[in-house]
Regions:
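Conserved catalytic or regulatory cores that recognize and/or transform ribose-phosphate-containing ligands
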Residues: 1-135
Length: 135
């Protein structure tokens, strides 16, 4: 049994802020994560730049991200890139049929400089063990 208590950050598209999708993803993450999970839309004030969000991410143990229509928006892309630079594990939450699954993010690909909602893609791989799960 895992006795460690973690701090996580839920990065997601602004297009799903205050929607049922955001609520379902957040509840799934909370119910499976052994620790406190920060949702910037619910727990942080709105900042004009990405820097305050990145400063917060520096303090977390894990970053969880979701794609919107197969892409990362610029904010989520920058949050993931920063977490990876800081050696903070990043996991993507993917919908496979009726199930939600975690995969480890191993790389990011910037696909646009101008479309802020289809800014990047991620490369992920399946994992056998998830150290942050509630048991």
């Amino acid at each position: 049994m895992n006795n460690k208590y973690y701090l996580g950050y839920y990065s997601h598209s602004k297009r799903i802020f205050d929607t049922e999708i955001e609520k379902l993803e957040y509840e799934f993450l909370k119910s499976n994560f052994n620790g406190n999970l920060i949702c910037p839309n619910q727990h942080l004030e709105k900042f004009d730049t990405i820097r305050p969000y990145l400063e917060f991410i520096r303090k977390v143990d894990y970053l969880f991200v979701t794609e919107y229509e197969g892409y990362l928006g610029k904010g989520s892309y920058e949050e993931c890139a920063y977490a990876l630079e800081q050696f903070i594990p990043v996991y993507v939450l993917l919908k496979r049929g009726d199930e939600l699954q975690f995969e480890l993010v191993i790389d990011l690909i910037q696909v646009s400089k101008y479309n802020l909602f289809e800014y990047g893609e991620l490369v992920s791989k399946g994992v056998n063990q998830l150290p942050f799960l509630n048991h």
